[in-house]
């Protein structure tokens, strides 16, 4: 729990010494759910017309429907999804030697096979047996499990009105296992630093799936020792999905929560949020902070480029791929439930 969440919760509980509960604050679904159980959260659905709701990306609004009953308890302001980041410089000699291409990284099954080939290719560089290098990792393991299961038609945490039903199909879970844990155990996948971009920087990985908001952290060089390093260029690719399945994109990012107050206070918060998510305002805020706008009009690369913001080539690639994912892929995030999962954290395997 962050300091912000702890302070808001203390205010909601009326603890001695706590500040007054704010009218509006930034938070995730789990925190909104906890406050909603206390009767502190405003349903914003009645304050928006059908036309106003239609302006927002559907999946972003649905996250705020905590109980799946048509309410809106979290207002979207900026979001992110996941992409595949690749060290294109060190990929080049591997690709030339083995014939693999970026197309092989479109599916999880393809990533596993490429990782196997990379391990064997690097293993053959020395006379020491079984010293091949890992190819791939993920920042958020939970996203792989939940979105991967969703692609295969399984909702692991199926929530309705705050009540969760657990679905754990053996075949689906086995496929998730075979395409992550098995290659990890074999040394084809890896995780050692706090984030997978750290592992790329140290040369321990060549590729990883991470947040679209994390592109500024992709390293400019690989440091193979305290005295040796070389510059690298990134390649940004779509997040791999399972073969034969329609892609499901993770949606991430805090939203705005309005707490109960006077009618004037609530309406003021709603008007601010509507203004804040108007395309020109939302583009400036979201893109400058590394996130994606939340309306259809703003979540458009042409609109962003026309806004006058200076975009690097990498940022343009990230936006292009991310916006395509949120507009065309199914978006998924877990709905909150009692003692449910908190926002995805970096994956560090034991």
Predicted regions and their residues:
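Glycine-centered hinge/linker elements that transmit conformational signals in sensory
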Residues: 112-119, 159-193
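Paired acidic/hydrophobic, glycine-rich loop segments that form the ligand-binding mouth/hinge
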Residues: 23-26, 206-211
